[in-house]
């Protein structure tokens, strides 16, 4: 009897060991994904949260009209699991979108447009040059926000001294950690791809004007920098767009948007496709 009990105990010990190993294997090797595709917007877009003056009409998302002193934002309705506290893993992600800035003329344009990653309870911040995402040019870790800005108006307090319109990567401050001069093509569609490589912590931005008629000018731009997302943003975030106007103005519109993220070492997945 004792021998049988010993064998049973050994069997259960081996079984539990195999079970725990299997659970750990799948836990470590599973991947949580979030995906969505919006090829065109609709007036009753269900998967967006609108803030300020943001709204959708047939085929486009309008963040601001070409009027003074406005702030408009739109967030994807579901939170994104951008890093995992238990494993320390960070998600790889790529997002692409097409946007248009329409101003009455190409000289008096303000203030700009961003794609941003922020806490789940994010609210519109200061307008004007702060682009509805930040409140200060000083680094503030409590902001917990990363943004890619497409800045159309020079602000001497924090913008590059060359006074150019620019693309910038912002981390907890409206003062960009890196910038690239950018020539706005008023009324032209711009295609943007933003990708984050979790292995290197490199955030890369590319912008192209596919239908540009300005053959003598640069029509594509690339910018990158190291951003440690895990040290900046919360584990769960919202993603979205923001745009502002001031004394000068423009309409800021998004025509399409896709997003895909993969976070390894977790056990759930979420996918969505929206036409």
Swiss-Prot record:
The GO molecular function terms of this record are: D-mannose binding; metal ion binding
Q: Does the keyword Calcium apply?
A: yes
Q: Where is the signal peptide?
A: 1-30
Matching InterPro entries: ConA-like_dom_sf (IPR013320), L-lectin (IPR016363), Lectin_LegA_CS (IPR000985), Lectin_legB_Mn/Ca_BS (IPR019825), Legume_lectin_dom (IPR001220), Leguminous_Lectin (IPR050258)
Give the record's glycosylation annotations as residue positions: 217
- Give the source's domain of life in one word: Eukaryota
Q: Which UniProt keywords apply?
A: Calcium, Glycoprotein, Lectin, Manganese, Mannose-binding, Metal-binding, Signal
Cited PROSITE patterns? LECTIN_LEGUME_ALPHA, LECTIN_LEGUME_BETA
Q: Does the keyword Isomerase apply?
A: no
What SUPFAM superfamilies does the database record attribute to this sequence? Answer: Concanavalin A-like lectins/glucanases
Do you know which Pfam families this protein is assigned to?
Lectin_legB (PF00139)
| Recorded family membership | Belongs to the leguminous lectin family.
Q: What name does this protein carry? A: Lectin
């Amino acid at each position: 009897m004792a021998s049988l009990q010993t064998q049973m105990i050994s069997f259960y010990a081996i079984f539990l060991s195999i079970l725990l190993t299997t659970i750990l294997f799948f836990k470590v090797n599973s991947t949580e994904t979030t995906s969505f595709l919006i090829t065109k917007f609709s007036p009753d877009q269900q998967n967006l949260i609108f803030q300020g003056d943001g709204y959708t009409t047939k085929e486009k998302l309008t963040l601001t009209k070409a009027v003074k002193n406005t702030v408009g934002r739109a967030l994807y309705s579901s939170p994104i699991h951008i890093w995992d506290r238990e494993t320390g893993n960070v998600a790889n992600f790529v997002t692409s979108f097409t946007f248009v800035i329409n101003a009455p003329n190409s000289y008096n344009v303000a203030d700009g447009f961003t794609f941003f990653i922020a806490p789940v309870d994010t609210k519109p911040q200061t307008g004007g040059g702060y682009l509805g995402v930040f409140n200060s040019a000083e680094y503030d870790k409590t902001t917990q926000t990363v943004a890619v800005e497409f800045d159309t108006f020079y602000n001497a307090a924090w913008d590059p001294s060359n006074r150019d319109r620019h693309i910038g990567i912002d981390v907890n401050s409206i003062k960009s950690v890196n910038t690239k001069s950018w020539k706005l093509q008023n009324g032209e569609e711009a295609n943007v791809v933003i990708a984050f490589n979790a292995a290197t912590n490199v955030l890369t931005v590319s912008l192209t004007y596919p239908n540009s008629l300005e053959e003598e000018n640069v029509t594509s731009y690339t910018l990158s920098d190291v951003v440690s997302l895990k040290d900046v943003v919360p584990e769960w975030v919202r993603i979205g767009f923001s745009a502002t106007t001031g004394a000068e103005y423009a309409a800021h519109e998004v025509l399409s948007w896709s997003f895909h993220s993969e976070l390894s070492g977790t056990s759930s997945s979420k996918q969505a496709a929206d036409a």
